[in-house]
A protein has these predicted regions:
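A cross-family phosphate/adenosyl-ligand binding-site feature
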Residues: 1-120, 126-329, 333-403
């Protein structure tokens, strides 16, 4: 999933030969899930048609302050304030000069001057124009203002000369902006280990001890963590949840509590920053596993159980600088039991949900949680979708790490 999904991007196209490349850039933004609004300078029409750009962006293309046929006013202030990012590509020497000197003689420039968001500009011009001291001064002015330069490439230029001034390729511009967006996410470069789903403890080749966990909560936390820039490892018990469009999440599938224990321990000391144990791990397993199917010969059946390793307890005991989060699903004395678990297992935070709450717990797409931490703070939340719950959990973690 792209960090740009859902972002609104204004693409300003100016009158340079590289304008034809911007069609590919628009297409890439749209494929990343962006809403793209294009503004062309009048000169840009000489190099690419509004019809092409409108088709690719799925939005009308603006050039003038108002439509001469309908009288519709294209409000440059509203346009500027509606966007997350503005991308000027290609940015000609003429346009850079006007941007640096606060000229507003067309809709594109007026929109730029009204912007309070991040502006990227990708210069495109001949070598001597790019190296010209006045042009360099204009670029420096824009950078001092806070605009971000996407450096041009070296290569064959429109004049036939070789050198610096060739607009960065569409894929390079996209990657540049994605990397910028990722670096500004709250969990950028943080390594987060998440567990999800149930564990199955085999009795014989066809039967097992398990629970009703669907894995939805853990998977939503993994997805939300990835959106916030984290490097995510998800250790999942058997469940039907998918990670479509989240290819950067490393998923490790396990079956039993012993397999989950081993996987968690293997990753725990691998520079992990945050551990979120959302899995419903079986507390007990059969003392012996039958190699053949057990027949129902007797009226009663006794199955000796032995205790599984307590993964959270072990993590808490060996914790260094990791932020450790546990989950507690309770049926009675909820806060008391959750607080006891928090303290006994040396957790930083615990997420409590109760089976007494309608719409919360296993299999539902919603959940109602209470968050307790090791400093005595308690946060209560209403019933929400598990996607929103995941966002609130991560927001709470971020705030507690900051303090």
């Amino acid at each position: 999933m792209s960090v740009l999904e859902g972002k609104k991007i204004i693409v300003i196209i100016t009158g340079g030969i590289a304008a034809y490349k911007t069609a590919s850039l628009v297409r890439l933004f749209v494929k990343r899930g962006c809403e793209v609004q294009i503004i062309m300078t009048p000169e840009a029409h000489n190099f690419i048609t509004p019809l092409t750009l409108s088709t690719l962006s799925k939005n009308p293309v603006y050039t003038q302050f108002f439509d001469g046929k309908t009288g519709q006013w294209n409000n440059h202030v509203d346009l500027a304030l509606s966007a997350d990012y503005i991308v000027v590509a290609p940015a000609t020497s003429n346009t850079l000069s006007k941007m640096a000197s606060a000229k507003a003689d067309n809709l594109a420039l007026a929109t730029y001057l009204s912007a309070k968001n991040v502006v990227f500009f990708a210069p495109a011009m001949d070598l001597d124009m790019y190296k010209n001291p006045f042009n360099k001064e204009n670029i420096e002015k824009l950078q001092q203002k806070g605009d971000i330069l996407i450096p041009p490439n070296k290569g064959e230029l429109a004049s036939g000369l070789e050198g610096e001034g060739r607009m960065a390729e569409p894929e390079e511009i996209l990657n540049f902006i994605e990397n910028f967006a990722r670096k500004n996410l709250i969990f950028y470069k943080k390594k987060i280990l998440i567990t999800a789903g149930p564990t199955y403890e085999p009795i014989d080749p066809v039967r097992f001890i398990g629970n009703h966990s669907s894995g939805k909560m853990g998977f939503e936390i993994a997805k939300a963590s990835e959106k916030l820039g984290a490097d995510v490892t998800l250790i999942s018990g058997p469940c039907s949840q998918k990670l479509s469009h989240y290819s950067s999440i490393e998923r490790i599938n396990v079956m039993s509590s012993e397999e989950m224990y081993q996987a968690v321990i293997d990753y725990y000391h691998n520079n992990i920053d945050i551990v979120i144990m959302a899995a419903a791990v079986s507390d007990y397993r059969p003392e012996t596993i039958s190699k053949i199917k057990i027949k129902k010969n007797e009226e009663s059946f006794s199955l000796p159980l032995i205790k599984n390793k307590d993964i959270l307890l072990e993590l808490g005991a060996s914790k260094r600088n990791q932020f450790l989060v546990g989950f507690a699903l309770e049926t009675n004395n909820e806060e008391e039991n959750a607080l006891k678990k928090l303290q006994q297992k040396n957790l930083n935070m615990i997420v409590l949900n109760s089976l007494q709450d309608k719409g919360a717990g296993f299999s539902y797409d919603t959940n109602k949680i209470t968050i307790l931490d090791n400093k005595g703070n308690i946060e209560y939340f209403d019933l929400q979708t598990k996607e929103k719950v995941a966002e609130n959990i991560l927001k709470s973690i971020h705030e507690k790490i900051k303090t």
